[in-house]
């Protein structure tokens, strides 16, 4: 191919690409300015620029529409009004307010479904001007939270994996940095995870997790070394076992002492009963007038002897009964 022809073809392709980048289907403009706002807040969309604002007085009709994409052939009408006519705008949807003085569209309590392309058309007698912009809504990011997801200790070093998370926010980007450092830490693919290997020389290190999206940012600091300190319960389990063993021994000693005390009380009661046993000797003699008659019976003892062993009452705890023996000598009456 002729070099001049090749150059001409290249120029034509360049113009085609430039035209396609500026216009979509039906000649719609593609390079719409992008407006970023916070989700849920009131949004004001300036649907104009200086040149359109100057020619607004010559317009006979204004239409504001919204589309989910520039390639979509269907648009939702939001505002339709004639500047020369008095009265409120027509077809004004809920939560919308149009300010004619500066051609600004207000959206109350913005929602995700409000995202899209907003187009304003100014119709004149013989011409039409169009202006568009793209609205993107983002949820504000909350304060991040840093947690230790994994910890290992070996040879005096501590290896940690930190995780940084947020409860609220979309399209969130994460970055890590050290408070005393001059250069940010760069985990793989700006991950919310950070791996650290620390030693005693890093005891004062403080790390910062920063979260951000196109409309907001927030950060949180974290000192990991306190979580790496040696836990006595982990490194000295023998102390726990020694304490348990000592407790068991003390319980056994107390049980033995109680048993010995009970046996001592029982022996004391038995000894006391034996010591306090009394023997009573009683002698009974018949009246005097019979003394003469009894002389004829020298072999018989005129006296009666009674032996009685008396004991004190036995405590209730002692169930053994003591027997009482009575020895009596009885003489026969005189016939």
From Swiss-Prot:
Q: Where are the transmembrane segments?
A: 238-258
Q: How does it assemble?
A: Interacts (via cytoplasmic domain) with SH2D1A and SH2D1B; SH2D1A mediates association with FYN; SH2D1A binds to phosphorylated and not phosphorylated ITSM 1. Interacts (via cytoplasmic domain phosphorylated on tyrosine residues) with INPP5D and PTPN11; presence of SH2D1A facilitates binding to INPP5D. Interacts with MAP4K1. Interacts with PIK3C3, BECN1 and UVRAG; indicative for an association with PI3K complex II (PI3KC3-C2).
| Ranges spanned by the short sequence motif ITSM 1, renumbered to the chain | 279-284
Please give the residue positions where the record annotates the modification Phosphotyrosine.
281, 307, 327
According to UniProt, where does the site described as Interaction with measles HN protein lie?
A: 29
Q: List the disulfide bonds.
A: 158-228, 164-209
Q: Does the keyword Endoplasmic reticulum apply?
A: no
The impact of changing residue 307 to F is: No effect on interaction with PTPN11/SHP-2 and SH2D1A
Q: Which Gene3D superfamilies match?
A: Immunoglobulins
> What's its membrane topology?
Single-pass type I membrane protein
Q: Could you say which tissues express the protein in this record?
A: Constitutively expressed on peripheral blood memory T-cells, T-cell clones, immature thymocytes and a proportion of B-cells, and is rapidly induced on naive T-cells after activation. Activated B-cells express isoform 1, isoform 3 and a cytoplasmic isoform. Isoform 4 is expressed in B-cells, primary T-cells, dendritic cells and macrophages. Isoform 4 is expressed in tumors of the central nervous system.
Query: Post-translational modification, briefly?
Result: Phosphorylated on tyrosine residues by FYN.
Annotated Ig-like V-type domain ranges read 29-138
Taxonomy, superkingdom: Eukaryota
Lineage of origin = Eukaryota, Metazoa, Chordata, Craniata, Vertebrata
One Gene Ontology cellular component term attached to this UniProt record is: phagocytic vesicle
Q: Which residues lie on this side of the membrane: Cytoplasmic?
A: 259-335
Name the record gives this protein? Signaling lymphocytic activation molecule
What residue stretch is flagged as signal peptide?
1-20
Q: Where in the cell is it found?
A: Cell membrane
Q: What is the effect of changing residue 29 to S?
A: Reduced infectivity
Motif SH2-binding at which residues? 307-312
UniProt-recorded Gene Ontology molecular function terms: antigen binding; identical protein binding; SH2 domain binding; signaling receptor activity; transmembrane signaling receptor activity; virus receptor activity
Record remark on domains:
The ITSMs (immunoreceptor tyrosine-based switch motifs) with the consensus sequence T-X-Y-X-X-[VI] present in SLAM family receptors have overlapping specificity for activating and inhibitory SH2 domain-containing binding partners. Especially they mediate the interaction with the SH2 domain of SH2D1A and SH2D1B. For SLAMF1 a 'two-out-of-three-pronged' mechanism is proposed involving threonine (position -2), phosphorylated tyrosine (position 0) and valine/isoleucine (position +3).
Annotated PANTHER family = SIGNALING LYMPHOCYTIC ACTIVATION MOLECULE
